[in-house]
Amino acid sequence: MFFVRCTLYLSVSMIKLQPNTFPPHIDKAAIQELPLTHFEGEVIVIDHPSQVAEAAQYLNQFTVLGVDTEARPSFKRGVHYPTALVQISTQERCYLFRLTHVGLPVEIAQILANPAICKVGLAFKDDINGLRRRRDFKPANCIDLQSIVCKYGIMDLGLQKIFAIIFGKKISKSQQLTNWENSHLTPEQARYASTDAWATLLIYLVLQQTKPLSKKQVEALKQAEKEAQYQRQQEALARKAQAANEQNS
């Protein structure tokens, strides 16, 4: 069993937000100026079947969990690797289940299928499908942040951007393309993986404390997004045409 102690903590109870004050977007340059944060709780790597029961017993105590997965990156078209890691986090502790070592344990599949426990992820359908290839189960009460953030005025869909919009802090994505099938996870990989699962949980908890926009407000925001996207496309076409004219003149 492998423990990692992190150095920062972001407590939902310490955050006071006014409802409907989130900006719809944040650009990459603005994110780079934000202070870096990461999960500072206990990280436990599960790489032997004997560790699973205790982890499942702990996780079953909670009604909301943050979930994320990782797979070995592929740099060839059409080549995909199976899910290598599933991270399940509370605010204080994150378990990293190494599926290359323990498969998808039945106890964890039962948590994912338990309607009494809310599981929160991002692009969650892809994660769930990957996990079901390890062991089939019927997912229940799984919430995808991408399907709900627009109700709070947030149009960006990436985890780093959503987190930055809500908390004004940056989470690192530097370990995303590392090899998750290595014999041992590095401390940097463990920190990255736990931070992603924890971040989804924290985002959900804050949104649950925030009054959503009305349906009319959401539709108006979506329409504004479509118009802005169309304007950007027209500007890009105009620049391309201008460049072609300059080349031909």
Where are these regions (language model features)?
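N-terminal accessory regions of nucleic-acid-interacting proteins
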Residues: 10-65, 134, 145, 198, ...
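Short conserved active-site loop signatures built around small residues
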Residues: 68
